[in-house]
Amino acid sequence: MAPVQALLFDVFGTVVDWRSGVAREAAPFLARHGIAADAHAFADAWRRRYDPAMAAIRSGARPFTRLDILHRENLLAVLAEHGLAPESAPAAEIDALSRAWHRLDPWPDSVAGLTRLKARHIIAPLSNGNVALLLNMAKRAGLPWDAILGAEVAQAYKPQPEAYLRTAEILGLAPGACMMVAAHNGDLAAARTVGLRTAFIARPAEHGPGQTKDLAATGPWDVVARDFLDLADQLERLQEPHVLPA
């Protein structure tokens, strides 16, 4: 394999367990406001609005808007679906819950795996999250990124080509010197189309026990790994010696 200098990571679902974290944050809010909903189902309903909220931005119908703002808008819509009018809850409570995405826990292998990978490669998120969200998450979870490049840096949301290409450009690297690491086959397909290398990491619990999508690699990815530690093992075998740029 040709040298890979930077590993660029999808975050929600690949590095952190968004579903459990959002459910944990939502549960006391729902109880406090008398909303009889399962916290994990509530998290799923909130997450289902994630991609549609970005569609208007990708199409150009709406100017680029940070994910924190989209998350808050989506939260208000989901709360309304559950019978809670926005004005009936203190704005501070809504704000705190909308930032649940800043406080997500890493998968058990994430920190140790990233630390190993960092020794040989530049590691950075390539996420639809905004800089403040990713920074707060990293500080809380101990994610050892070399750089934090939120979507507002590229002014594009995956799977737009600009999201991948501008990230590589900002790092001063050709697309082929970067590897996209994700638990989502669609993300990898978009990255591969614009010249990035690809690594699939299975996260079969991302969507809970009923998950049916992305249980296995479905494309010709460069690496398929069980977790980040396995990814480190495979890259160490494939790429000797160290390939960090001078």
Placement of each model-derived feature along the sequence:
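Hydrophobic alpha-helical core bundles mediating ligand binding, dimerization, or RNAP-core interactions
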Residues: 22-30, 46-50, 71-72, 94-101, ...
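Alpha-helical elements of Rossmann-like donor-binding domains used by nucleotide-donor carbohydrate transfer enzymes
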Residues: 24-28, 45, 73-77, 96, ...
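A metal-dependent, Asp-based hydrolase signature
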Residues: 34, 40-43, 48-95
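Generic structural signal for small/hydrophobic residues in well-ordered secondary structure
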Residues: 10-13, 75, 125, 191
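Short, acidic loop-to-helix structural element flanking the phosphoryl-transfer center
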Residues: 64-69, 84-124, 161
